[in-house]
Design a protein with these regions (language model features):
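P-loop NTPase catalytic core
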Residues: 134-439
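N-terminal accessory targeting/assembly segments
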Residues: 1-86, 91-95
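A generic structural signal for well-ordered coil/turn residues at beta-strand boundaries
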Residues: 9, 17, 30, 83, ...
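Active-site phosphate-binding and catalytic loops of NTP-dependent enzymes
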Residues: 3, 75-79, 94-99, 116-122, ...
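P-loop NTPase nucleotide-binding/switch module
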Residues: 66-68, 82, 95-142, 155-160, ...
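Residues that form or immediately flank small-molecule/cofactor binding pockets and catalytic motifs
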Residues: 18, 48, 92, 113, ...
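Residue-level signal for beta-strand positions within conserved beta-sheet cores that form or flank
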Residues: 9, 39, 64, 83, ...
Length: 439
């Protein structure tokens, strides 16, 4: 990033840590960019005339007499229709070999939308994954996390959602990705011919961890452009928010801030909320919906990152491996969409809420039957039928590799009801039984 002529140059750094450096400077703003010995940095703390800079590439090789030049602006992204189909790094620079994007330069990390300009979410976001669309329906303008163990195929799930989701634009923000994961997303999107509606901002494990902090703001700035300027439905996919939080912790620790729970900074809640609160439904029709992966350490849902996330978001989606079918499913017991009632049975078929509730109840009966069997108790005929139903339900609907529309999901569920149960055991309104029961 080039500097301008006649800019003031500072050459006396008072303190250097692994990720930050401090010096005395005046007329500097918070979040302002700077060049330190040729490396890009950003102002993260101002105390009087003492300014602390976060150096994205790390401070290795920077002497105390290094030249520091402040650029007079925060990180920016050039927004235009040319963003579509492109891959960028954390600074909004192309990494796909394509040309630079021409467009309006916009500062990233702006405020969330004023509540008076928001509309209550009311549009269905269909993903083709029954564990989401059937049981935990997503609504435009919603913010919801995917909780998953690090060894689960959450990136494949995100890629599937990107290809199947019925939205105008998909924006992927990848933080701490391996090169294999980056190439996986790139190849999947290219082979599916879907690049024209997908925009990706990627930080890999080969890039400095601190750069991850820019990825969500880059992705959301692009999302705001398409949602506001073009009134489009935009789905933002962020993976992995735990990597983002780890980068926050790195900067916080190297600034000698007192850590909070699980070594995370005390500002973690605000840092996460600033991202998630960008989800919005505009009265004009445009919307930003956020799905973000949060990996769990040893399945610990009480860790500071998922714990704070749960207070901010409108539900959560849990991935787990089902030992009976050997596939990863969306767990119906631990998953929840707090806004599904806004579209379930209204934007979908009228029998949707009752079918969803009945299926989950029968799946719970199967879980109880499995516990009885494991403890050596005899199973009733109903228990055996419930277990058989649960296996088919997981395989044909809950598994993440299943791709159906909501009407097909409901029809498959009705087929399973009639295969294993009597109408009175399913406990659904007679008008729906008369119309949809498979005879």
């Amino acid at each position: 990033m080039a500097t301008k002529a006649f800019q003031k140059i500072y050459t006396k750094i008072s303190q250097i840590t692994k990720a930050t450096c401090s010096l005395k400077a005046t007329g500097v703003g918070y979040d302002e960019l700077a060049m330190v010995n040729g490396k890009l940095a950003q102002v993260v703390k101002i105390a009087g005339d003492e300014v602390t800079l976060q150096v994205f590439e790390g401070t290795e090789g920077i002497p105390t007499n290094a030249e520091v030049v402040f650029l007079g602006k925060s990180p920016t992204l050039k927004v235009s229709d040319q963003l579509a189909g492109r891959f960028f790094n954390a600074f909004g620079e192309p990494i796909d070999g394509g040309p630079e994007v021409e467009g309006t330069e916009v500062e990233i990390g702006g405020p969330s939308v004023n509540p008076v300009r928001r509309k209550q979410p009311s549009e269905l976001i269909a993903t083709g994954i029954a564990g989401i669309d059937l049981n935990n329906t997503l609504v435009s303008g919603q913010k919801i996390p995917f909780f998953a163990d690090p060894d689960q195929t959450f990136n494949q799930v995100m890629a599937n959602v990107a290809l199947r989701a019925e939205t105008d634009k998909i924006i992927l923000g990848g933080m701490g990705m391996t090169n294999d994961d980056y190439l996986y997303f790139k190849n999947v999107f290219s082979n599916a011919g879907a690049l024209d509606r997908i925009i990706s901002f990627v930080n890999t494990t080969e890039n400095p961890p601190v750069e991850r902090l820019l990825i969500p703001d880059m992705a959301l700035t692009a999302a705001e452009y398409f949602a506001v300027e073009h009134n489009q439905k935009v789905l933002v996919l962020l993976t992995d928010m735990t990597s983002y939080a780890d980068a926050l912790a790195i900067v916080s620790n190297r600034m000698d801030q007192i850590p909070s729970k699980d070594s995370m900074p005390g500002s973690l809640y605000s840092d996460l909320a600033k991202i998630y609160e960008k989800a919005v439904q505009f009265p004009s029709g445009g919307s930003i919906t956020i799905i973000a992966v949060t990996t769990l350490s040893g399945g610990d849902i009480t860790h500071a990152v998922p714990d704070n996330t749960g207070y901010i978001t409108e539900g959560q989606l849990f991935l787990r491996r089902d030992s009976d079918i050997g596939k990863v499913i969306v767990d119906p017991f631990r998953s929840l969409s707090r806004l599904k009632q806004l579209v379930s049975g209204k934007k979908t078929r009228k029998d949707h809420p009752q079918v969803m509730n009945a299926a989950v109840r029968l799946y719970a009966d199967a879980a109880n039957a499995k516990t009885k069997m494991e403890n050596g108790f005899d199973l009733t005929n109903y228990d055996e039928r419930a277990l058989a139903f649960a296996k088919d339900y997981a395989n044909q609907l809950l598994a993440i590799d299943v791709n159906l529309n909501t009407t097909e999901m409901l029809d498959v569920t009705w087929g399973l009801f009639s295969k294993y149960f009597k109408p009175e055991e399913v406990n659904i309104k007679k008008e729906f039984v008369d119309q949809y029961w498979k005879k």
